[in-house]
Amino acid sequence: TWWPVRFAAQLTVVLGAGSLRVQLVVHNTGNTDDGAWDFTTALHTYLRVEDVGRAQLGGLDGCARWDALADARGFQQGPVMFLGEYDRVFSAPAGAIHLHDGALGLQISQSASLSNTVVWNPGGALCARLADLPPDGYRSMLCVEAALIDRPITLTPGQQWQGWQELRVLPAP
């Protein structure tokens, strides 16, 4: 699809020792006659896990959440666990999120400019219908996306916005 506004977007990926940082910069390159425009975004981070049924996400306890499957709002209580299809949008926590899947740990941080965290796993039934995943692919993947969904950003000509997500491998316990 064509987006009828003047803009520049730059995605930077930085690999470090045990870390990965993804940064997105969006710039309204229009002139004053073009005016402002709004946008939302998400850094779609697909993570490999050993077994999603044993995976847990910590750090979202107490965060407001919207369950996209049930169209229900509430607050997260305890760690996030995965027992089937999962699609929720959280208010991003002030601190880092921790993913544990048995053997491996991952610390997930994001900039305050990305005010949401999307957590998604297709579960077995949906995964079987997806062309880009094997039928049992849901068992070894999890999306933890730094996002900006609830409050779109408005950029006037000349303004820019940036957001980032960083993944850091945690030492074995």
Q: Which residue ranges define each predicted feature?
A:
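Conserved SET/PR-domain catalytic core that frames the SAM/AdoMet-binding pocket
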Residues: A17-S19, H27-G30, Q159
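Hydrophobic residues embedded in beta-strands of well-ordered beta-sheets
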Residues: L20-V22, I97
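Asparagine-centered strand-capping/turn motif at beta-strand->loop junctions
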Residues: L24-D33, V169
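Active-site/ligand-binding surface loops and adjacent short beta/alpha elements
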Residues: D33-F39, T45-T117
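Beta-strand residues in well-ordered beta-sheet regions across diverse protein folds
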Residues: Q23-V25, G58, S109, E145
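Extended, loop-rich substrate-binding clefts of extracytoplasmic carbohydrate-active enzymes
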Residues: T1-A17
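Beta-strand-rich recognition/accessory modules
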Residues: T1, A8, R88-P173
